[in-house]
């Protein structure tokens, strides 16, 4: 029972995440990863990552859909998530019992109220396929990144060489 419950919870959160992403940019989380992860693009298409802006991109960065969103998309996603969480908090404060199925229905109504298109299915790309694709692109990008990367030590040595050339 616990496994089924946790599986149901994971599916619920994946559904909410995908509907929110779709409302903002017309793609599920997995679809945005597959559409934007590209080893030929600057920073592999990522707009943010754990060690941004000057640190290296690591494998775990590339399978996070939010990392591919621009500032405006990210702001809009955060805004719509915050509005929905505020609504959920208000429902809880009013002691209104809700099942996960109720929350899915309320989410669709909330998105329609906000005049955005509502995702009706699970999307065209699974999370597993998106992760595999992004990690494959990362393996190609890592070679490029390593050739361009300048460590702090390298920067220090280059600065010292420049200073020696000036003096």
Model-derived features: positions:
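Positively charged, phosphate-engaging catalytic surfaces used for nucleic-acid and nucleotide handling
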Residues: 1-167
